[in-house]
Swiss-Prot record:
This is Alpha-lactalbumin. It comes from the Eukaryota. It is found in: Secreted. The lineage of its organism: Eukaryota, Metazoa, Chordata, Craniata, Vertebrata. Residues 1-19 form the signal peptide. Disulfide bonds join 25-140, 47-131, 80-96, 92-110.
Amino acid sequence: MMSLLSLLLLGIALPATQAIDYRKCQASQILKEHGMDKVIPLPELVCTMFHISGLSTQAEVNNHSNKEYGIFQISNNGWCAEKQEDVANSVCGILCSKFLDDDITDDIECAKKILQLPEGLGYWKAHETFCIEDLDQWRC
C-alpha cells in the first residue's frame, strides 16, 4: 500500500510539460522552417544537437560552474538568465528555463546569436569531436 501511495504522489509531483525527443529529420525540418539552413549546414547542426542534448527539449546539464539548457544546451553564462531581474543583461534576453519547454523557437533564435560567434558551431565542443566528417547519417 505504501509503494502505491508513493507512486501516486510521484505522478502528481511530475511536471505537466513532457520533453520532446526529436528525431533527426523532425529537428532538421523545424530548423529549416526557421531559416537555419541559410545559417549553417543542417546535417552538422543536427549532429551537434544530437551529441549535446540527445535532441531533447528538456536536457539540462551542470557543467562546472555553469548550467546548460535545452536542445541546444545554451549556457547560463551570459546567454540566458537564471532570474527574471537578470534577463535584460543576457545576450538572448530570456530566462534559461524557457529553453526547457517544448517550443524551441526561442532556442533557435538564441542559437542563431551563438552561431554568429567567430567559432560558429565550434561553440559546442561536440561539433568538432563528432560532426565534422562523415555526415551522411545526419542528412534528411
